[in-house]
Amino acid sequence: MPPFVINTAPLSSACAEWLEERVEVQHCDYRDEATLRGLFGRADGLVIATYLNVNDGLLDCAPRLKVVGRAGVGLEHVDLEACRRHDVRVVYTPQANCQAVVEYVFALMLDALRPRPLIEGPIDAERFFEWRRTEVGRQLDQLTLGVIGFGQIGRRVGAVARAIGMRLIVNDLLPEDQLRGEVDFPFEVVDKATLYANSDVLSIHVDGRAENRNLIGDVELAQLRPDCLVINAARGMVLDAGALARWAAATVETGGQAVLDVLEPEPPAADCPLFGLPNVRLHPHLAARTDTALEDMGWVVRDVWAVLQGEQPRFSAW
């Protein structure tokens, strides 16, 4: 009998077909708990995307499980210690969506700093020239980008910023000597207070570990420049939504802006304090959604198969 794998990720046809040639696959919606629980008992492998929680409760229902494949980067929904206790390997795709997220961050940045109204039909001269007078953006090579979390994505964001001509300041858990040994472009390592106080644009790239919940709240936001642009394409739980709403409301007149691709929870609750603020833009977690990134994330199935064959996977979380 071939191994049995449950898939809850949006695999491309190529990835799905590749897996189906090797194992028995059941494709399921991650929200269909009843169906999943009925299948866990015979599952040898599990492929997940963003939202399914892999914890002791799930693992206790899956005594045959050998491997969890995360089609993506973040592992905050996977309890790695629980997986170790149950002897379940965890594989993922840490490099798959970096380019997509970096491109998206700069798309958000340019949308916010370089406004560009659309001409969608006939327009009179007064409106046309009014736009030319009033729509004045900020030039990136005159700005300082602060990156908090200088990992794979943060570094690539920094590389693009430097290529454009932005000053780059960063804060990370790793020591400066190690960062400089791994990065070949100019940057300044600063403490968090200095980063907040000097950033024209603050781009957040920390991971979803528990210690990062509400990493940025009232105290941190109060240190920002009043015209700072805050971009979060990392994890929604990093930013205290209530604190951000207060900061945004206080900086409407001074040019403060926030653009969020991630929220806590997703989708946002009906009473989300960020709704209705003119200088806050919310997006539905799209940073990694390119055809290339989705394909590359889906190829986690290769490492799932490797573990099931008793081979060493390419990218293992433990």
Descriptions of predicted regions:
Residues 54-57, 173-273:
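Rossmann-like adenosine-cofactor binding region
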Residues 2, 65, 141-144, 227:
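Phosphate-coordination loops involved in phosphoryl transfer and adenosine-cofactor binding
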Residues 1-91, 217:
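An N-terminal-biased, well-structured beta-alpha scaffold segment characteristic
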Residues 86-88, 94-144, 159:
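Phosphate-binding beta-alpha-beta segment of Rossmann-like dinucleotide-binding domains, i.e.
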Residues 150-151:
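Glycine-rich Rossmann-fold phosphate-binding loop(s) that bind the pyrophosphate
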Residues 268-269, 277-297, 303:
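Adenosine-phosphate binding glycine-rich loop
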Residues 154-155:
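N-terminal Rossmann-fold NAD(P) dinucleotide-binding loop
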Residues 295-318:
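NAD(P)-dependent dehydrogenase/reductase Rossmann-like domain
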